[in-house]
Amino acid sequence: MSTTMREMLEAGVHFGHQTRFWNPKMAPFIFGHRNKIHIINLEKSLPMFQDAMKYAKQLTANRGTILMVGTKRQAREIVAAEARRAGVPFVDTRWLGGMLTNFKTVKTSIKRLKDMKAQQEAGLDSLSKKEQLTFTREIEKLEKDIGGIQDMTALPDAIFVIDVGFHKIAVAEAKKLGIPLIGVVDSNHSPEGIDYVIPGNDDSSKAVTLYARGIADAIIEGRNSATGDVVKAIAEGSDEFVEVEEGASA
């Protein structure tokens, strides 16, 4: 769960957007500019990313769930792969309005998807060809829209977002519900309201991989830590048992 300055440089984390598109609220995290492109200060980004990973690890160690969000073309496959590796829910195609604020309705759709999957496994021979086609189209749409959150039984305890501007609806919903946000913020967006800001390039696939892999590693370490604590507690608890001789009276 460690990232170095060199890794960030190689991933292009320091490359911001064109200076004319900058958000002044990102000024504390900008080192300067080169060829009209803002350069993000990695001496700020590195410790802030480490703080975000530490938080993700602690939250997961305490049985918390993190929802990973990345629906931009260059982030989709990376976010989905890392979320699956870490065993957490994710949104990689598009954010449906109300995914958090109207989670009760979303849960109904999740149940529908699971029921359809069970029906599909049992066989669709009883349906006509037209009905099978309609069925297939519906299940494909549900899988595309909510497949990544189908095992999410309750609201997440935190959300990790790549590009807070692109996912402003997700950010707004999380803020409204008081769900902590870990967000990658480029030079053209505001870090306000983001609990754990990661100042950096949100367009480069290499940078996106670095962020997603780091958070996924932290989640895995946190879960392993929690499992280790349980095993340790059971082992230590075994010392408390006192053997009672057979036939001993109360």
UniProtKB/Swiss-Prot annotation:
Gene3D superfamilies: Glucose-6-phosphate isomerase like protein, domain 1, Helix hairpin bin
A biological-process GO annotation: translation
Calcium keyword on record: no
Family membership noted in the UniProt record: Belongs to the universal ribosomal protein uS2 family.
Protein name as it appears in the record: Small ribosomal subunit protein uS2
Protein species of origin: Variovorax paradoxus (strain S110)
Lineage: Bacteria, Pseudomonadati, Pseudomonadota, Betaproteobacteria, Burkholderiales
InterPro entries linked: Ribosomal_uS2, Ribosomal_uS2_bac/mit/plastid, Ribosomal_uS2_CS, Ribosomal_uS2_flav_dom_sf
GO CC annotations, alphabetized: cytosolic small ribosomal subunit
Alphabetized CDD domains for the sequence: RPS2
Molecular-function annotations in GO: structural constituent of ribosome
Cited SUPFAM superfamilies: Ribosomal protein S2 (SSF52313)
